[in-house]
Amino acid sequence: MWLSTSPYRKGSQCGEAFSQIPGHNLNKKTPPGVKPPESHVCGEVGVGYPSTERHIRDRLGRKPCEYQECRQKAYTCKPCGNAFRFHHSFHIHERPHSGENLYEC
């Protein structure tokens, strides 16, 4: 038997109680009397997780990963020059160059 350790949550619009629904799925609107999230960078209202990181990154002009080793593309296709970060992507790409038949009739 599964027991919930968290208290029941109430929907902000309907008032129903839920025991196994995450808070972000209850109701999408902010309940009355509760201030919506605000960006600490620009002051824009309504910025909430999971878009918070992306919003702040956009406002500050940062890229998702600023480390060179994260952006490095280690696998380069010799016939066409395309580069790939992952071996699996490279392997799929090089199949047509090798003349390998992917599917049998």
Swiss-Prot record:
The keyword Oxidoreductase does not apply. Coiled coil: none annotated. SUPFAM superfamilies: beta-beta-alpha zinc fingers. InterPro entries: Znf_C2H2_sf (IPR036236), Znf_C2H2_type (IPR013087). The keyword Acetylation does not apply. It comes from the Eukaryota. Keywords: Metal-binding, Zinc, Zinc-finger. This is Putative zinc finger protein 861. It comes from Homo sapiens (Human). The gene is ZNF861P.
